């Protein structure tokens, strides 16, 4: 066979193979490659959405954490204020109670002083009568001289 005829036969076979490949083999390969490219693109898009969702979730979590910390700080502040007001109220109540107890004690002391003075006046009056009795060497009648004794008590 001639080189030209062989070359032409090979060209014909090559073009038939190329035509068959382009008609029957190439479209399924291209479809498979397109599907694969689409899956890869979808996967990348999903990854980007996942990243953006993650970033948004982190922002929401940070915002929630911040608001929870602020709420906790507010509650702590409110509790401290309430505790301080309770302490102040207790101090005020204690001061009022102390003042009341002191006033009661002073009133009791004044009453006791008055009672002791009255008792002392009675004793002094009795001693004065006894002294006068001894001086006069006679008995002084207390019933008769009650006005005199009361006046003496008042002077003392």
Swiss-Prot record:
- GO cellular component, as recorded: plasma membrane; proton-transporting ATP synthase complex
Gene Ontology molecular function: any one: proton-transporting ATPase activity, rotational mechanism
InterPro entries in alphabetical order = ATP_synth_B-like_membr_sf, ATP_synth_b/b'su_bac/chlpt, ATP_synth_F0_bsu_bac, ATP_synthase_B_chain
What are the TM regions of this chain, as residue ranges?
A: 7-27
Indicate yes or no for the key word Transferase: no
Name the family.
Answer: Belongs to the ATPase B chain family.
Give the quaternary structure.
F-type ATPases have 2 components, F(1) - the catalytic core - and F(0) - the membrane proton channel. F(1) has five subunits: alpha(3), beta(3), gamma(1), delta(1), epsilon(1). F(0) has three main subunits: a(1), b(2) and c(10-14). The alpha and beta chains form an alternating ring which encloses part of the gamma chain. F(1) is attached to F(0) by a central stalk formed by the gamma and epsilon chains, while a peripheral stalk is formed by the delta and b chains.
Q: Which NCBIfam families match?
A: ATP_synt_b (TIGR01144), PRK05759.1-2 (NF004411)
Give the protein's recorded name.
Answer: ATP synthase subunit b
């Amino acid at each position: 066979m001639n080189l030209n005829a062989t070359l032409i036969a090979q060209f014909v076979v090559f073009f038939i193979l190329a035509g068959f490949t382009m008609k029957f083999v190439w479209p399924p390969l291209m479809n498979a490659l397109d599907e694969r490219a689409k899956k890869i693109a979808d996967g990348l898009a999903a990854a980007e959405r996942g990243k953006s969702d993650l970033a948004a979730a982190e922002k929401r979590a940070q915002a929630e954490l911040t608001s929870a910390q602020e709420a906790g700080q507010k509650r702590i502040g409110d509790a401290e204020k309430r505790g301080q007001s309770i302490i102040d109220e207790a101090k005020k109540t204690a001061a009022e109670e102390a003042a009341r107890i002191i006033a009661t004690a002073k009133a009791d002391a004044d009453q006791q002083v008055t009672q002791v003075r009255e008792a002392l006046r009675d004793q002094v009056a009795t001693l004065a009568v006894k002294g006068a009795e001894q001086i006069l060497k006679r008995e002084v009648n207390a019933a008769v001289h009650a006005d005199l004794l009361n006046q003496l008590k008042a002077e003392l």
